[in-house]
């Protein structure tokens, strides 16, 4: 336990939530103004830089407020800002797994690039609420639904193997057994309807496959939050610092995804590296009670698989150009 006091005053929470709401509103306005579109690397870089800048400004404001308060002082201010940045960087690092799974989910369901922005926008907003609940309620909720990790781990492994073996032909979503389980709970149509999550068929309101993708995005973030949130609690037990560092890091997930997605389109064999990563993550979840795989090893496997697939792609495409 830290010797420093918690700093989650109503004022601090108010400033934090106001900053988040303003940024979310700006994101929503941008989507409404530009409509469904493919996010390019310049736009992704701009949003990534903006989120990092806002996070740094918040940390700077927090330091000034704490250092100028006689109850806390400079020592507490320095410690809390250090905890914030440590938690922020840790969450950003662990988010690598999320990004690759997002790529896998979009690839598996063959979601058009111009609709991915909308899915991730709502997916990230949902993730904020879910992560806040997990942070404040604690590990009890995670233990109660621990079986979800095994279920989704099996799904990830199955999807990774299937993607590695699949061709580029259109896939019949209605024939997928795993999706059939979800469809028994939520009526899901077999065809996409632009960027709509719901549509009307035969006089009944049903979900589109895009809504199913949104559900998978939400579930994947919840699963990986089981790793990342306890990791941040190892840095600090102050719920305000855990919440703020986690949320600011997650808000940049969408922009990070499009940075990687734009690169992925340029490498012909990258999908095999991503499929391997997906399978590895699935196995990691399935074996978590018997084999503990450190995050450092997980990231090494991720970057190793991606590096190998990218290098192979570069060699292959260079040979094609030279012919």
What are these regions (language model features)?
Residues 1-323:
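Multi-pass alpha-helical transmembrane bundle typical of ion/small-solute transporters
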């Amino acid at each position: 336990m830290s010797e420093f006091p918690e700093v989650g005053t109503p004022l601090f929470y108010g400033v934090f939530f106001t900053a988040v709401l303003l940024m979310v509103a700006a994101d929503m306005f941008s989507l409404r103004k530009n409509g469904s579109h493919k996010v390019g690397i310049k736009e992704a870089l701009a949003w990534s830089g903006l989120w990092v800048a806002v996070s740094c400004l918040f940390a700077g404001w927090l330091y000034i407020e704490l250092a100028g308060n006689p109850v806390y002082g400079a020592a507490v201010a320095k410690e809390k800002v250090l905890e914030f940045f440590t938690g922020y960087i840790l969450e950003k690092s662990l988010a690598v797994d999320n990004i690759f799974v997002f790529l896998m989910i979009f690839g598996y369901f063959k979601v058009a690039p111009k609709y991915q922005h909308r899915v991730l926008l709502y997916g990230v907003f949902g993730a904020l609420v879910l992560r806040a609940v997990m942070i404040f309620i604690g590990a009890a909720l995670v233990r109660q639904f621990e079986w979800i990790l095994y279920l989704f781990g099996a799904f990830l492994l199955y999807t990774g193997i299937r993607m590695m073996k699949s061709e580029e032909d259109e896939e019949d979503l209605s024939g997928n057994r795993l999706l059939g389980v979800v469809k028994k709970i939520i009526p899901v149509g077999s065809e996409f309807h632009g960027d709509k999550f719901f549509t009307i068929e035969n006089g009944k309101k049903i979900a589109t496959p895009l809504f199913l993708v949104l559900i998978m995005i939400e579930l994947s973030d919840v699963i990986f939050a089981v790793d990342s949130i306890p990791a941040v609690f190892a840095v600090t037990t102050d719920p305000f610092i855990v919440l703020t560092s986690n949320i600011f890091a997650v808000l940049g997930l969408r922009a990070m995804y499009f940075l990687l997605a734009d690169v992925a389109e340029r490498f012909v064999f990258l999908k095999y590296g991503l499929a391997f990563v997906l399978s590895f993550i699935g196995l990691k979840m399935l074996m978590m009670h018997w084999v503990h795989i450190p995050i450092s090893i997980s990231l090494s496997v991720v970057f190793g698989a991606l590096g190998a697939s990218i290098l192979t792609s570069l060699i292959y495409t260079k040979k094609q150009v030279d012919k």
